Structures are given as C-alpha cells and as structure tokens.
Amino acid sequence: NVNLNTFDKKIASDIALDIREAGRAKRDNQGKIIRDNDGKIIKVPGTLKHCKAVGWYIEEYKQAQVSINLTNYKKNSIHKTFEEVRKQARKRGVRVTGSEIVGLLPLDALVSSGKYYLKKQKRTTGLPESDLISIAISSLGLNDISIFDHNKKIIEILINTEKTSFSDMKLKSFINNISRETPTPGGGSVSALSAALGAALTSMVANLTYSKKGYESNRNMHIKRSEICQELLNEAMIMIDEDSRSYDEVINAFRLPKKNSEEIKIRQESIYTAT
C-alpha cells in the first residue's frame, strides 16, 4: 500500500486506474465510455504489468492509499511499482509519503529494491543482505505509518527463526564451543568460517576500490566481484551449520541397530542419505 499526502480517495483511485494492468475504460471526447461491436467496454491498459490496484481512504491513518497486489514481483518489482506511483502522484499535485507491506514477502523482493536504490545513488551493491534490506526499508518509506520489522515480514527469516545457528553466535561463544569436548562444531565449520572471512575481505577490497578515484571505468567489474563475494560469504555461513548438521546425521545413522536384514537395510540407507 502506497501512502499519499491527501485525504482524497478519488486521487488514489485515479492513480490505481492508471497503473493497474487491467487499466481503465476508454472514453470519447464527451467522457462517454467506448464499447466494441459486442457491447464490451474497451479498456486502456495501465502502465504496469502483473499489477492489481485500487484507491481508498484509511480513516486510521487519515490518508488516502493506493492499495496494490503484485502478482509477479520478479517481473514487476516493488520498487518499480513504488516509483510509478510517485510519478503518477506528482502529475496530480500530491506526493507519496511512504508505504506499507501487508502480510509477508520474499527476501529477494526487498534485496532487489535495496540494490536498485543503491545503483541510483551510484553506490556499490555488493553489501550484506542486512544493509540492502535497510536501504530498501528507508527508500520505500516502510516506516511511514508503522514500524516495519523485517524479522516478522520476510518469509525466509521467519522460517529460520527457530533454528539454532552457530553462525549467529558471538565470536567468543563460537570459539568456546569449538574448544569443548564435543565433536561439533569442528574442522568443517571452522573451514567454512575461514571461507566466509576470506570472501568478506575480498568484498571489502572490491567495494573500497569501487569508490576510489581513477577506477571509475572498472566500477561494473568491482560491483560484480563484490556481489559474487557476498554470495560466497552467505553460502559459507550456511556451511558453518551444515557441516555440523551433516556430521550429527552421519553419527546417528551409524548408531542405528543392525540385528537383522531389515535393520541393516534401513541403516545403510540412512548412512547413504546422511553422506
């Protein structure tokens, strides 16, 4: 929902008609609706694909809103839609004050918006996901009428909230865990951490070089490299936990009983799956 600095629902509805894929009824010079030979209303398509929209007034906020449903955010992004509403609002003498997201959304939807606004600022996009999310939240004005808690709005974060993660530990706690008389976290997790740190350092170098004078012609290369490093960093962070999880599964599989042919078969299948 995109918020406008007006009480007028008609303005919000007019914007909705102009942007939604279904568009609005075509009219003649006298304002009469034009129909085809079968009597069906001829429509003028809206400016955005994969977009349904309506305008309304929210008494609670004392603001008009353009309420939007994006049916394919990968083909029509949140930021593209937000910017189009801003453009249409300016034509009508009003301005967008911010927006809100009702329900949940995929992580990629916010990350791609963060990258879009960083590119507009001519800044590097090879940054941690948390930074990209923060940029998206501020650029889309998601805190305009209520606090936007991305930990409660992003699907992937909600799915992983209940999982215990070594990668979320403080460094000192993680090191102490390694030193204990338990097999996990072990060498694989430490190696994954080393890989993550290496990727982070390489990303830092690429990002520092991006903004350095004299390297302007190579900016695209540095952005690409820093983004690749961020992907590798994220993969390595996942592997910190995956190595320990895999080890535990293998050990549990080897501990299964093997007193008869059926148990032996189940045990072998479990070992195969775990490895």
Model regions and ranges:
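Disorder-to-helix initiation segments
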Residues: S167, L171, S179, P183-V190, ...
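Short alpha-helical scaffolding segments that buttress acidic/His motifs in well-ordered protein cores
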Residues: F174-I178, D243
